[in-house]
């Protein structure tokens, strides 16, 4: 089979309807648009969501929440993910290179989730109280 010989199946494509070509075609005179009204006119259509002057749904519903502009710059790292890093001294750059935080991250925070199995030294990274206790119990330190 060649790409230039591929054709749609029989009956899969319908011929385009020619409108306004006489009463016998079934689509003459008004061309399937009915009589009068906004939808019968040329260029006469309303915007998406328009409800005929009634207050539209997106304006009837209350506003809710917001999108934080700082969320994309702050990342969390699990305690167990620190075991994946080959280095013992961990800073933001090391986390970025390992792919544990986003490239545009400016702040990282270590949270208590899992266990740290070796002594690690954190530099310039904030930690939760539980994570701090776990790191220091494993012989690590936080600067």
From Swiss-Prot:
Q: Which key words tag this protein in UniProt?
A: Ribonucleoprotein, Ribosomal protein, RNA-binding, rRNA-binding
Which InterPro entries does the record cross-reference, listed alphabetically? Ribosomal_uL15 (IPR030878), Ribosomal_uL15/eL18 (IPR021131), Ribosomal_uL15/eL18_sf (IPR036227), Ribosomal_uL15_bac-type (IPR005749), Ribosomal_uL15_CS (IPR001196)
A molecular function GO annotation: rRNA binding
Pfam short name (any one) = Ribosomal_L27A
Which Gene Ontology terms describe the biological processes this protein takes part in? translation
UniProt entry tagged with the keyword RNA-binding: yes
HAMAP family membership: Ribosomal_uL15
What this chain does, per the entry, is described as: Binds to the 23S rRNA.
Q: Which NCBIfam families match?
A: rplO_bact (TIGR01071)
Record's family?
A: Belongs to the universal ribosomal protein uL15 family.
The name this protein goes by in its record: Large ribosomal subunit protein uL15
Per the UniProt record, the source organism is Chromobacterium violaceum (strain ATCC 12472 / DSM 30191 / JCM 1249 / CCUG 213 / NBRC 12614 / NCIMB 9131 / NCTC 9757 / MK)
């Amino acid at each position: 089979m060649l790409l230039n010989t591929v054709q749609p199946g029989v009956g899969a494509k319908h011929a385009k309807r020619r409108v306004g070509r006489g009463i016998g075609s079934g689509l003459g005179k008004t061309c399937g648009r009915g009589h009068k009204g906004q939808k019968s006119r040329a260029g006469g259509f309303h915007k998406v969501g328009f409800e005929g002057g009634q207050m539209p749904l997106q304006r009837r519903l209350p506003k809710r929440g917001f999108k934080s502009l700082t969320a994309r710059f702050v990342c969390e790292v699990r305690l167990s993910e620190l075991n994946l890093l080959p280095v013992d001294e961990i800073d933001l750059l090391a986390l970025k290179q390992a792919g544990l935080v986003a490239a545009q991250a400016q702040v990282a925070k270590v949270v208590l989730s899992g266990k740290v199995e070796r002594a690690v030294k954190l530099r310039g990274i904030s930690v939760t109280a539980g994570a701090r206790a776990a790191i220091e119990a494993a012989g690590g330190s936080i600067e």
